[in-house]
């Protein structure tokens, strides 16, 4: 992440990507997986206060680098993933409370220190006031959702090009415009059911390390969906993250696939362990 901050390319105002041989990739997407394995490895046996503090310092460094790179969505995903993995490892509500308070304080500090954070908050608070500049994205997104209504305008009958970066940040708005809000709600239900299945698998795992990994993947997955859809519907400020498996972006799709492969591999391992115990 530090290398990207120094040498990376600026994409849509954020320094988050590299280009090698004409192929652009976003390292922060792949670092998510390494980050989760680091958290699980650090906390699966030792959950002492000293270990949690050391883990928090390292996790905090990741978040700070992402904020400075203007990759606010990834910073939030890393932070929330850390807080909930720590809670899953310790079962201590004080850590959860401290994470929420710390996150709120950090958000306020980021608002005071970084112009790009203030711009996104202002655009979220009153996009109609800034419809010609910083509020243009969110207003066009809301127009698209409203135009689609319940049943949509029909496939290929919408106007997705009116929304900047529709293929990434605002793909949900385009789906609602062409296929309708009902279809969008069904899509949300599919994502939520996938999350619940991840948590169900995590609860059944006896190996603490694998359990924390699956918990972390589930939290990051559902929180990223919340950020994308919430930003596009003006429920929260825009964060610039993709909708897993749906938005355009090879790094995002590949990372999500790897995360699902990891869970599937752990689930197969769990089934085999159950068969061995049943045989005995």
Name every feature range the model reports, one short phrase each:
Residues 56, 133, 137, 163-171, ...:
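Juxtamembrane loop-helix boundary motifs flanking transmembrane segments in multi-pass membrane proteins
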Residues 13, 147, 239:
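Arg/Lys-rich, often Gly-containing low-complexity segments of ribosomal proteins
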Residues 228-280:
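A juxtamembrane structural motif centered on a specific transmembrane helix
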Residues 1-134, 173-233, 258-262, 280:
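Hydrophobic alpha-helical transmembrane segments of multi-pass inner membrane proteins, especially
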Residues 23-25, 30, 77, 156, ...:
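Short capping/connector residues at structural and topological boundaries
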Residues 145, 149-182, 202-205:
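Long extracytoplasmic/lumenal interhelical loops at the membrane interface
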